[in-house]
Amino acid sequence: MKPQFDHKVLSSFYLWFDDRVTRHAEAVESGISQQFFYSNNSVDVPANQVAYYSPDRQFVANGTDVPSGVYISGGSFGNSYAFVEQNPSDPTGLMIDFNQGRVVMNAGVGTDLAISGNFNRKTVNSYITNESEEELLFNTDFLLSEQNDETFLQSIDGLGSLNYTVPAAFLSYNSSTNKPFELGGMRDTKSNLRAVVIANDNFTLDGILSLFRDSTETCVPIIEFEDFPFGEYFHIKNPPYDYQAIYQEKMSNSANYAFIEKINCTKLYDTSSSAMNIPKDMRIGFIDFNLSTPRLTNN
């Protein structure tokens, strides 16, 4: 199926949301020296590729100072570290997966490499989720990004786990409707998006709710699917990726955009969490966004 309007709204909103958290709120930890380790438990990596995982998820991808590659030694690289950039013409096929905190390469590089790099780490992650709220809150095992100075991947078995890492916000498209706007087929698409925020302390949860409560009456440029900056492994397709530059370019060229009309923030209090089997010590919040996008639709 070709990407439809709702797909574009959600993916564009994700980019805006993540930029708000990482750049405006500065929910990042800078200059983390990462070591990447091979895992054969990668359920989403085919046999002709290998994945090496770091102890962290997610990496910050937004900005002009994001590393374009990693340092590799061992195998055909020899005993000294060589800097390998993500480049379509590079024989390693290196791709940096900023979402999973890993590098994916062609299987021919081997499984005994030493890989390192310096990446900024998000302290609040952002995900687009396919799960319903019930599945997300009641049937999902969350991994805490840091617990007793032990990274989450050191506290579980297996590097290839696809578990969500919190603190995090989970974005979903809840509902929409078209309303007549003007003659000639112009309609106003009202989109209702929700962010479920899960954190392990009230400071983080209150900060995220406050940040977005004050983000109403803001424009979110609609980015075409082919211009979405991330590829299949959540690698940057054409580095560097700078959302602020994309935002300014789109808005100055009168690109189609969604206007955030209203934002409502609520919290799920501990008194009800015990009855609903929500993970212990987790704080839950909801942010509801009402978006308006006047546009021409196909009848």
Residue spans of the language-model regions?
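Intrinsically disordered, low-complexity acidic Ser/Thr-rich regulatory segments
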Residues: 121-164, 243-256, 263
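Compact, glycine/acidic-enriched structural inserts
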Residues: 204, 214, 218-232
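Surface-exposed intrinsically disordered loops and tails
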Residues: 73-76, 87-92, 134, 143-144, ...
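Beta-strand secondary-structure signal
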Residues: 114-116, 190-196, 286-290
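Extended beta-strand solenoid/passenger and fiber regions
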Residues: 2-93, 99-114, 118-135
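Beta-strand elements of well-folded, non-transmembrane domains
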Residues: 119-123, 175-177, 195-203, 290-297
